[in-house]
């Protein structure tokens, strides 16, 4: 670049207003992506070294041994350097999206768009939170003597979901790491929070490690996050006790309330990436967004489709790495908008609506469905007049209402579940929560699958896979159970029912190892036992639990749509798929003929790549993909997901594409 151009660029930087933009790159450097993902490569090792041991353990549990993906590779250093040489200061590096964010003027935007390795330059939207968070200060005390702990005025909000019962069994969130994204946290001095095990905290507004108020914040900045933290994990006897009071925590301040409650998309995504790398098991966010800065254009209801907003795409990617993700459904029930708000529209996030202590839906609680028709919210919890800590005090509390109050209660229940069963994968957790909530037989777009229950979730049977062995776990809490009476009765297809004795492995936990079967066979079972008074119990009371051998998800009321026999719709082959070496990636399936096989493939960021509608023939059918998008370009290296609708069922298939 000659001197005159430099002067023009410099002068323009001074006089042109700057907004924040995402700069998306086409690749992660000139090296072949297959080589970059080689376990001996520098790029692979750098990605691996960015993860804590706990993060690696969680990924392996949920993803298997191929737990480093293209999204995890660092952004190519030379690309960043060339961008910075244009006078640009990079604000956030988002490896998952192969992008950086930076403040740019119009001249810089045009220069950057011309760079051969830049895919696109797009505005970072400012997400405005319509905060209907209502509160009043109250220091009343209420002692309750019929539970293991005295919950004080917080009793009604935890009792609705059966939390005191689980606490009485010495399950309180031990060995679980929870990440909270909120407005800030004044936790070090309040009596209910000061002894919490906070392993890391970061302020994504001011870029420092202080999440409590500091110079530049308004007084109410950290009020919301402090209150939310106490609902999840506060512990002051006779005043407030949250569900996960023995868990560990990571805190991220992502919301700026100095003028309006807002968070920039890149900060939210960066916080999730950071938490995931530290090994978080669960994330919870009480921030929901549907209104945006007019200068950056607004999202609409049609964007609440699980794959459009950056915050939603970020929670999708966190889930794919084994994190159980929670968020408030939103407080839009009384507004013209009415619907859930991003990131509650995510595919696998558990969005949480609000009910009162009697279980009645709160009028303000956002409703579903998503734009593409999925039921939302997933569950509800008490979110009316919940009792929690007041920031900037040592021992004052307040009542408040909102789905921002119900979300931490729900995420705390999952901490109890994971504490009881550390082997659970996040897809199992999500299924258990939906199956065990109060409305699972008739889910709707008001309360979803119903009121979440800690007791029901932990009593729901689950599977642990060790090599090729499938071990059933069933918690039985009834008093004076005859250990020798606990039986599982199961069958395959129309075979005769066979009873087998279960053994107690730990207190309350009875186990059974299923005999080896062929993948795809459907097993049905129920469990029986009796107590010392000869009372007989059958679980479930009628019908059967069921699961497809080779998978780890047990169903009762819900369809096992994505867990059907492998013989119906195959996995991708070859996988990984290398277009230079293989002509196509293939999926095989059987059909009776004249059926519609609908498939669309999305990339790791949730963007649709192709869509196909295939009319089937009788017998074997074949779907092939050559790696090219519907727009005609060869797709970048990364993880791709096929969503399939066929024969009244839905399937999900994963493919790694390497160039």
Name the predicted role of every residue range.
Residues 250-256, 281, 339, 383-447:
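Hydrolase catalytic cores
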């Amino acid at each position: 670049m000659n001197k005159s151009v430099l002067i023009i660029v410099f002068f323009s930087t001074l006089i042109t207003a700057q907004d924040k933009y995402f700069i998306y790159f086409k690749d992660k450097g000139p090296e072949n992506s297959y080589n970059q993902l080689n376990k001996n490569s520098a790029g692979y090792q750098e990605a691996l070294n960015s993860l804590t041991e706990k993060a690696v353990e969680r990924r392996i549990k949920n993803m298997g041994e191929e737990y480093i993906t293209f999204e995890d590779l660092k952004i190519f250093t030379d690309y960043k350097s060339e961008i910075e040489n244009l006078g640009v200061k990079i604000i956030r590096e988002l490896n998952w999206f192969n992008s950086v964010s930076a403040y740019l003027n119009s001249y810089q935007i045009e220069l950057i768009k011309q760079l051969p390795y830049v895919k696109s330059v797009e505005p970072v939207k400012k997400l405005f939170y319509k905060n209907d968070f209502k509160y009043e200060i109250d220091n009343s005390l209420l002692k309750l003597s019929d539970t293991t702990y005295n919950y004080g005025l917080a009793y009604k909000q935890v009792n609705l979901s059966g939390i005191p019962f689980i606490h009485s069994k010495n399950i309180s969130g031990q060995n679980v790491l929870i990440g909270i994204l909120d407005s800030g946290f004044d936790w070090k001095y309040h009596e209910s929070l000061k002894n919490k095990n906070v392993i890391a905290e970061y302020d994504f507004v001011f870029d420092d490690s202080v999440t409590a108020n500091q110079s530049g914040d308004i007084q109410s900045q950290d009020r919301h996050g402090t209150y939310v933290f106490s609902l999840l994990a506060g512990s002051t006897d006779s005043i407030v006790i949250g569900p996960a009071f023995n868990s560990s925590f990571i805190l991220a301040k992502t919301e700026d309330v100095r003028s309006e409650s807002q968070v920039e998309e890149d900060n939210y995504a960066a916080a999730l990436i950071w938490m995931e790398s530290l090994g978080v098991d669960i994330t919870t966010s009480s921030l929901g967004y549907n209104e945006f800065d007019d200068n950056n254009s607004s999202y609409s209801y049609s964007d609440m489709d699980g794959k459009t907003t950056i915050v939603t795409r970020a929670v999708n990617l966190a889930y794919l790495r084994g994190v159980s993700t929670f968020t408030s459904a939103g407080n839009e029930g009384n507004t013209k908008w009415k619907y859930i708000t991003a990131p509650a529209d995510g595919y696998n996030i558990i969005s949480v609506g609000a009910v009162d202590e009697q279980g009645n839906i709160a009028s303000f609680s956002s409703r579903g469905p998503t734009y593409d028709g999925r039921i939302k919210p997933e569950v509800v919890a008490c979110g009316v007049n919940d009792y929690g800590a007041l920031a900037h005090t040592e021992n004052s509390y307040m009542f408040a209402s909102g789905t921002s109050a119900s979300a931490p209660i729900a995420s705390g229940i999952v901490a109890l579940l994971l504490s009881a069963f550390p082997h659970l994968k996040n897809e199992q957790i999500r299924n258990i929560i939906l199956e065990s909530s109060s409305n699972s037989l008739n889910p709707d777009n008001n309360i979803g699958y119903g009121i979440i229950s800690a007791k029901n979730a932990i009593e729901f049977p689950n599977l642990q896979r060790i090599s090729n062995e499938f071990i059933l776990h069933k918690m039985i809490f009834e008093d004076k159970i005859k250990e020798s009476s606990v039986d599982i009765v199961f069958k395959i297809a129309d075979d005769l029912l066979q009873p087998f004795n279960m053994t107690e492995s730990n207190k309350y936990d009875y186990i059974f190892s299923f005999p080896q079967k062929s993948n795809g066979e459907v097993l049905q079972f129920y469990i029986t036992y009796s107590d010392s008074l000869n009372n007989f119990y059958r679980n479930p009371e009628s019908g059967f639990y069921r699961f497809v051998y080779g998978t780890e998800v047990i169903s009762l009321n819900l369809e096992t749509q994505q867990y059907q026999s492998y013989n119906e719709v195959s996995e991708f082959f070859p996988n990984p798929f290398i277009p230079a070496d293989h002509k196509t990636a293939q999926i095989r399936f059987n059909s009776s003929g004249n059926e519609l096989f609908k498939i669309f493939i999305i990339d790791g960021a949730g963007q649709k790549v192709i869509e196909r509608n295939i009319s089937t023939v009788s017998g074997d059918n074949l779907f092939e993909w050559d790696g090219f998008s519907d727009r005609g370009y060869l797709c970048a290296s990364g993880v791709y997901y096929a969503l399939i609708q066929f024969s009244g069922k839905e399937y999900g298939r994963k493919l790694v594409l390497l160039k």
